[in-house]
A protein has these predicted regions:
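Glycine-rich phosphate-binding active-site loops on the catalytic face of alpha/beta enzymes
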Residues: 143-161
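Buried, small/hydrophobic-residue-enriched core segments of structured protein domains
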Residues: 1-118, 129-133, 139-140, 153-155, ...
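Hydrophobic residues within beta-strands of alpha/beta enzymes
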Residues: 31, 95, 123, 145-147
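Flexible C-terminal active-site loop/helix
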Residues: 155-180
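Active-site lining segments that contact anionic ligands and/or coordinate catalytic metals
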Residues: 92, 120, 144, 163-165
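Residue-level recognition of the GNAT/N-acetyltransferase active site
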Residues: 126
């Protein structure tokens, strides 16, 4: 369903998909962002963001709500953008939020990004979004440039998807020890 659904959504006007197989089969532009597991597999949130910016400098979209959006996520994103992207002259970047009070958090994040000189940084929102939720958060004054809409776009309401979240609980170090 995801592969054909991504194609149908693209025909209907969606800009792209996180489903890379739809890109390979149908030419639907693939794009996306990091997962919470990416952030958690590093010793620090900043290290995860910096590494992502180094690996994907022209498409850096950082997931800023793994721990604390306003106290660490956005500040660490700004630091990574400043240290990795700005020296290369790259101004195209984004942050993504997929939990919490999206309207409030995006307003605060926009102010923080603007004050740090990242007016060009886009803000993306996701988290089981549909047209009603999007309309509601926009009515609340959310500062969202992009919406990541997936399951509610291509899944029948009468046969919904399983609403689960995957987060990394531990990693195995090179010496074989398991670290929570």
């Amino acid at each position: 369903a995801a592969i054909i659904g991504a194609r149908a959504a693209y025909i209907g006007g969606v800009a792209g998909t996180a489903c890379t197989i739809s890109d390979q089969i149908y030419g639907v532009p693939a794009g996306g962002t990091m997962a919470h597991a990416w952030v958690q597999m590093f010793d620090s949130e900043y290290e995860a963001f910096k590494t992502y910016c180094e690996v994907f400098p022209t498409n850096a979209t950082l997931l800023v709500d793994t721990y604390n959006t306003l106290k660490s996520g956005v500040p660490n994103a700004i630091k990574a953008f400043n240290e990795v992207l700005r020296p290369k002259g790259i101004t195209k970047c984004a942050i993504r939020l997929d939990s919490g009070d999206i309207a409030y958090l995006t307003r605060e994040a926009r102010q923080m990004l603007d004050e740090a000189g990242w007016e060009s940084c886009k803000i993306s929102a996701s988290n089981s979004l549909d047209e009603y939720i999007i309309q509601d958060i926009l009515r609340q004054g959310a500062k969202v440039d992009l919406f990541g809409v997936g399951e509610r776009m291509i899944t029948s309401k009468s046969d919904p998807v399983f609403g689960g979240v995957y987060k990394l609980a531990a990693i195995e170090k090179e010496d074989g020890t398991i670290v929570p």
